[in-house]
């Protein structure tokens, strides 16, 4: 949402606007400040925020006339549905739909604090978009794929979040998920858009050529720019590397067959 308020105040009063999710991540999230002028005035925050409630901190002497918000979302309609005889699962599906909706912006992203897409997250959300949204929703996945390959480094490394500004570190396992069966190839399964596959295939092939096998014919671990495979303890990195590499090769093989390479 973009929060809105209408007040009557003297000049120079500072109003703070944030949501209850402002401290919800590892870093503080977005907020807004408004400095009043004399008289009756209204203000709508320029940047969208996400949370369960909007918190306005109003200085003494400011008369609040009205508060509100404008909901913003990606231009898509929800065509998929799920209904069963267990209300728990019906509610769970609606919550999942709402979460997906909140993550669909000009990129697939966490609306609390991110303004670019982590592609490991995009793999998960894109699978939901194919089930729940109309064709406009699928266009967001196409854009995400194009963003990923457009930001490929000269040495073949793929990384996210993209579009990038202050980050260029590869998370290898996430990139395998991105280019593989449940990432880029899943887009083709649900759209039949072979033109996009033809466009991105060379980038996927170039990236996977960076991965090598050891003397046991298991994939060699790549540390990338951020050596992170999963949350928690006792992470079986070797299993994860080989499982995601296998799925990535399956996606690449499907692309090659489609394109006759």
Regions found by a protein language model. Name each.
Residues 1-110, 121, 136-142, 159-166, ...:
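Extracellular/oxidizing-compartment recognition motifs
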Residues 23, 126-184:
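Structured core of small recognition/catalytic domains
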Residues 42-45, 83-87, 113-116, 132-139, ...:
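Alpha-helix capping and helix-loop boundary segments enriched in small/acidic/polar residues
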Residues 52-55, 97, 126, 145, ...:
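Short, well-ordered alpha-helical packing segments
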Residues 93, 97-108, 139-159, 200-219:
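Long, well-ordered core segments of solenoidal/helical folds
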